[in-house]
């Protein structure tokens, strides 16, 4: 089975070799028929401490690194949101 890959924004990089990534999903509400946004935070392993707050990154499923970390940063995929908007 292929590993899931999610795209999100780094909201914290204060921990050593760990980042917190906010992943947003959109879906249509079954009754109201309105597009709803829901977000969830994932702890991901960042071996080289490469990702910084505000960057858009891709994370993929992996073996458990700790109690909360079961995702890892996909190398070479970090993109700075502030630089692309300016």
Curated annotation (Swiss-Prot):
<keyword id="KW-0689">Ribosomal protein</keyword>
<dbReference type="InterPro" id="IPR012340">
    <property type="entry name" value="NA-bd_OB-fold"/>
</dbReference>
<keyword id="KW-0694">RNA-binding</keyword>
<keyword id="KW-0699">rRNA-binding</keyword>
<dbReference type="GO" id="GO:0006412">
    <property type="term" value="P:translation"/>
</dbReference>
<dbReference type="GO" id="GO:0019843">
    <property type="term" value="F:rRNA binding"/>
</dbReference>
<protein>
    <recommendedName>
        <fullName>Small ribosomal subunit protein uS17</fullName>
    </recommendedName>
</protein>
<dbReference type="GO" id="GO:0022627">
    <property type="term" value="C:cytosolic small ribosomal subunit"/>
</dbReference>
<dbReference type="InterPro" id="IPR000266">
    <property type="entry name" value="Ribosomal_uS17"/>
</dbReference>
<dbReference type="Pfam" id="PF00366">
    <property type="entry name" value="Ribosomal_S17"/>
</dbReference>
<dbReference type="InterPro" id="IPR019984">
    <property type="entry name" value="Ribosomal_uS17_bact/chlr"/>
</dbReference>
<keyword id="KW-0687">Ribonucleoprotein</keyword>
<comment type="similarity">
    <text>Belongs to the universal ribosomal protein uS17 family.</text>
</comment>
<comment type="function">
    <text>One of the primary rRNA binding proteins, it binds specifically to the 5'-end of 16S ribosomal RNA.</text>
</comment>
<comment type="subunit">
    <text>Part of the 30S ribosomal subunit.</text>
</comment>
<dbReference type="GO" id="GO:0003735">
    <property type="term" value="F:structural constituent of ribosome"/>
</dbReference>
């Amino acid at each position: 089975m292929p590993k899931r890959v999610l795209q999100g924004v780094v909201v914290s990089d204060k921990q050593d070799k760990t980042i917190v990534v906010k992943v947003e999903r959109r879906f249509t509400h079954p009754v109201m028929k309105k597009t709803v946004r829901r977000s969830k935070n994932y702890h991901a392993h960042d071996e080289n401490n490469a990702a910084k707050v505000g960057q858009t990154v891709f994370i993929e499923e992996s073996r458990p690194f700790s109690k909360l970390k079961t995702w890892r940063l996909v190398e070479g995929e970090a993109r700075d949101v502030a630089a692309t908007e300016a």
